[in-house]
Amino acid sequence: MKIIEHFVDGKIVPGSSKKKGKVFNPATGEQQAEVMLASSSDLNNAVEIAKKAFNDWSIRPPLQRARVMFKFKELIEKNSDELTKMIVAEHGKVYEDAKGSLTRGLEVVEFACGIPHLLKGEFSENVGTNVDSWSMRQPLGVV
């Protein structure tokens, strides 16, 4: 039986809990894998690592971030058939519907590739009667 472990800090890790959950194919009802369940310490560790990654990412210049997103886009396109098959197995969708879901997700990544020019913030005068609009880039952090 396939075991799905945790993916934290760019690595597959088993976690400290020995508890597992069953993963079913929703179209067939058959069990297709088991997933390792996280303990509270596994969760806290993952959140701390995500906070550190956020700090590193937030100081990275927008052009470097765009390069990462373009590489992500390239990987999605290169592996689209395999990813579509995973969506079929995980969500019970027919292939064409799963392909559409992947395409919609890819569109979000494509939008993110072009977003660096929007990160600058802006000021617009008189967007309404005696109303000016000002925006600034302010990362939210780990949510």
Language-model features: locations:
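Residue-level signature of catalytic and energy-coupling elements of molecular machines
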Residues: 10, 29, 65, 109, ...
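Conserved strand-loop elements at the edges of beta-sheets that form or border functional pockets
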Residues: 25, 37, 137
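Short glycine/serine/threonine-biased micro-segments
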Residues: 8, 13, 90, 119, ...
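Glycine-rich loop-to-alpha-helix module at the N-terminal edge of alpha/beta enzyme cores
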Residues: 32-119, 130
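Hydrophobic face of amphipathic alpha-helices that form TPR/SEL1-like repeat modules
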Residues: 1-27, 34
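Conserved small-residue-rich beta-alpha loop and adjacent elements
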Residues: 122-143
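Short capping/connector residues at structural and topological boundaries
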Residues: 12-13, 17-18, 100, 124, ...
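Gly/Ser/Thr-rich helix-start
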Residues: 11, 93, 115, 122, ...
